[in-house]
Amino acid sequence: MTLRRRGEKATISIQEHMAIDVCPGPIRPIKQISDYFPRFPRGLPPTAAPRAPAPPDAPARSPAASASPRSPSDGARDDDEDVDQLFGAYGASPGPSPGPSPARPPAKPPEDEPDVDGYESDDCTALGTLDFSLLYDQENNALHCTISKAKGLKPMDHNGLADPYVKLHLLPGASKANKLRTKTLRNTLNPSWNETLTYYGITDEDMVRKTLRISVCDEDKFRHNEFIGETRVPLKKLKPNHTKTFSICLEKQLPVDKAEDKSLEERGRILISLKYSSQKQGLLVGIVRCAHLAAMDANGYSDPYVKTYLKPDVDKKSKHKTAVKKKTLNPEFNEEFCYEIKHGDLAKKTLEVTVWDYDIGKSNDFIGGVVLGINAKGERLKHWFDCLKNKDKRIERWHTLTNELPGAVLSD
C-alpha cells in the first residue's frame, strides 16, 4: 500500500483501488494474467513439472536403475513425454521434485459424429415426410399417383401452420399438361389427402426416360404459393401393373434443366381407336381422348377439338370434327365417325387426324397431328395394318402428335 506522511491527503494507487473493489479485505498482490492461463500446447495436460537438480552429495543413479520397464509401444511416446516435461516446466517456479505422477487414464476414443451427407433426419425434421404410391397400368397406358399423407411439414404461415397441396410434374416436359395437383388442406402440418391423380397416354418409352417430380407447396391467397419440399422418382423403378409404396423425406428444391425441357417438349398425345365393321361396311374411327396438349392460349390452356380426314377424297366429304372442349390440355371426347368404304380399298387410304385450338374472331391454331396409313411408319403403320387384319375388332393405340404433317392442309 502507498504510505503517506502526516497531514498529507490519503492516496491509493489504481492497482490498490481495483484490488479493494474486487476482493475486500487485506490487499494482496495482483497476479499476472499468465498465472491464471498458463500456456500449454493443445492436447498436452500440465501434469509434468521440472525435476529439481540432484544435490551434490546424492549418489549417482545407474542407467539400469533409472530405466523402468517399457513396453514396445512406449517408444512411440518418448517424444510426447519429453514435450510434456518441457512445457510443463514453462512458467513454474523451482521447487522440490514431485512424487511419481499418477498413471494417466486411458484416452477415450472420439465419439462418432453424424455423417452430414447421409443424415436424413435433419431434412425430415425441417421439411417433413410424404407417403404416396405409384402404379403403371400398362394395358391402359396410365400412371396412377395416389397421394396419401404428409407428416411434420415445415410451418409456412404466421400461425405456425400451413395450407399444403401436392403438385406432380413429369420431367422432362414444360407443358402445363404435365402438371397435376391435389386439393388444398387448410391449417395443418399433417395433411391426409388420399387422392389419386392419373397421367394418361404414358408409354413404355416414357417409363424408361421420364421422372416424376412430386412437390409439396403452401397455398397463399395474397402472395405466390410457397415451396415446402420435393422428391423425384425415376419411372424406370416401377414394375408394370405393380403398386409401389413410398415413404420419403422431402428435400430442398432442385433446379430443372429448362433447355432439356424445351428440346424434348411434345405437342401432345392422342388415343385413337380403329375398327372395320362388316355390318356397316365401313371404317369406324374413334377419337377417345388427348393428353399433354401444347398450350396455345394466354391463360396457359387450349380449347381443343379434333378433325379426321380420310385421303384421298375427291368429293371432300370425309371430313369430321369433334366438339370443342374448353380450357383443357387433357380433353376427353369419346366420339366415333364412320367412313363407308370397302375393306379392299382401305390399303390405298390414309387417315389424317389433327388437333386444333378454337379461337373466337380469328384463325384457329394448329396444335399437332398424326397420319395413319400405308405410308406411315412405326406404331402408326402397325396400328393401320392391325385394323385391316382384324375385322370387327376395335384396336386402340396412343400416338404422339407432331407439328408437321407432309401433304396435310394445316388450315381450318
Swiss-Prot record:
<dbReference type="GO" id="GO:0032024">
    <property type="term" value="P:positive regulation of insulin secretion"/>
</dbReference>
<comment type="subunit">
    <text>Interacts with cytoplasmic dynein light chain DYNLT1. May interact with UNC13A; the interaction mediates targeting to the plasma membrane. Probably interacts with the SNARE (soluble N-ethylmaleimide-sensitive factor attached protein receptor) complex composed of SNAP25, STX1A and VAMP2; the interaction is calcium-dependent and competitive with SYT1. Interacts with STX4; the interaction is calcium-dependent, increased by insulin and glucose, and mediates vesicle fusion with plasma membrane in pancreatic cells and adipocytes.</text>
</comment>
<feature type="binding site">
    <location>
        <position position="303"/>
    </location>
    <ligand>
        <name>Ca(2+) 2</name>
    </ligand>
</feature>
<feature type="region of interest" description="Negatively regulates targeting to plasma membrane">
    <location>
        <begin position="1"/>
        <end position="36"/>
    </location>
</feature>
<feature type="binding site">
    <location>
        <position position="359"/>
    </location>
    <ligand>
        <name>Ca(2+) 2</name>
    </ligand>
</feature>
<keyword id="KW-0677">Repeat</keyword>
<comment type="function">
    <text>Calcium sensor which positively regulates SNARE-dependent fusion of vesicles with membranes. Binds phospholipids in a calcium-dependent manner and may act at the priming stage of fusion by modifying membrane curvature to stimulate fusion. Involved in calcium-triggered exocytosis in chromaffin cells and calcium-dependent spontaneous release of neurotransmitter in absence of action potentials in neuronal cells. Involved both in glucose-stimulated insulin secretion in pancreatic cells and insulin-dependent GLUT4 transport to the plasma membrane in adipocytes.</text>
</comment>
<protein>
    <recommendedName>
        <fullName>Double C2-like domain-containing protein beta</fullName>
    </recommendedName>
</protein>
<feature type="binding site">
    <location>
        <position position="157"/>
    </location>
    <ligand>
        <name>Ca(2+) 1</name>
    </ligand>
</feature>
<dbReference type="InterPro" id="IPR001565">
    <property type="entry name" value="Synaptotagmin"/>
</dbReference>
<feature type="compositionally biased region" description="Low complexity">
    <location>
        <begin position="59"/>
        <end position="74"/>
    </location>
</feature>
<feature type="compositionally biased region" description="Acidic residues">
    <location>
        <begin position="112"/>
        <end position="123"/>
    </location>
</feature>
<dbReference type="InterPro" id="IPR014638">
    <property type="entry name" value="Doc2"/>
</dbReference>
<feature type="binding site">
    <location>
        <position position="297"/>
    </location>
    <ligand>
        <name>Ca(2+) 3</name>
    </ligand>
</feature>
<feature type="binding site">
    <location>
        <position position="297"/>
    </location>
    <ligand>
        <name>Ca(2+) 2</name>
    </ligand>
</feature>
<dbReference type="GO" id="GO:0099502">
    <property type="term" value="P:calcium-dependent activation of synaptic vesicle fusion"/>
</dbReference>
<feature type="domain" description="C2 1">
    <location>
        <begin position="126"/>
        <end position="250"/>
    </location>
</feature>
<keyword id="KW-0597">Phosphoprotein</keyword>
<dbReference type="GO" id="GO:0005737">
    <property type="term" value="C:cytoplasm"/>
</dbReference>
<feature type="modified residue" description="Phosphoserine">
    <location>
        <position position="411"/>
    </location>
</feature>
<keyword id="KW-0963">Cytoplasm</keyword>
<dbReference type="GO" id="GO:0005509">
    <property type="term" value="F:calcium ion binding"/>
</dbReference>
<keyword id="KW-0472">Membrane</keyword>
<dbReference type="GO" id="GO:0005886">
    <property type="term" value="C:plasma membrane"/>
</dbReference>
<feature type="compositionally biased region" description="Pro residues">
    <location>
        <begin position="95"/>
        <end position="108"/>
    </location>
</feature>
<dbReference type="InterPro" id="IPR047022">
    <property type="entry name" value="Rabphilin_Doc2_C2A"/>
</dbReference>
<dbReference type="GO" id="GO:0045956">
    <property type="term" value="P:positive regulation of calcium ion-dependent exocytosis"/>
</dbReference>
<feature type="binding site">
    <location>
        <position position="163"/>
    </location>
    <ligand>
        <name>Ca(2+) 1</name>
    </ligand>
</feature>
<feature type="region of interest" description="Mediates interaction with STXBP3">
    <location>
        <begin position="257"/>
        <end position="375"/>
    </location>
</feature>
<dbReference type="InterPro" id="IPR043566">
    <property type="entry name" value="Rabphilin/DOC2/Noc2"/>
</dbReference>
<keyword id="KW-0106">Calcium</keyword>
<dbReference type="GO" id="GO:0048791">
    <property type="term" value="P:calcium ion-regulated exocytosis of neurotransmitter"/>
</dbReference>
<feature type="binding site">
    <location>
        <position position="220"/>
    </location>
    <ligand>
        <name>Ca(2+) 1</name>
    </ligand>
</feature>
<dbReference type="GO" id="GO:0098793">
    <property type="term" value="C:presynapse"/>
</dbReference>
<feature type="region of interest" description="Disordered">
    <location>
        <begin position="38"/>
        <end position="123"/>
    </location>
</feature>
<feature type="domain" description="C2 2">
    <location>
        <begin position="266"/>
        <end position="399"/>
    </location>
</feature>
<keyword id="KW-1003">Cell membrane</keyword>
<dbReference type="GO" id="GO:0019905">
    <property type="term" value="F:syntaxin binding"/>
</dbReference>
<feature type="binding site">
    <location>
        <position position="359"/>
    </location>
    <ligand>
        <name>Ca(2+) 3</name>
    </ligand>
</feature>
<feature type="binding site">
    <location>
        <position position="365"/>
    </location>
    <ligand>
        <name>Ca(2+) 3</name>
    </ligand>
</feature>
<feature type="binding site">
    <location>
        <position position="357"/>
    </location>
    <ligand>
        <name>Ca(2+) 3</name>
    </ligand>
</feature>
<dbReference type="GO" id="GO:0008104">
    <property type="term" value="P:protein localization"/>
</dbReference>
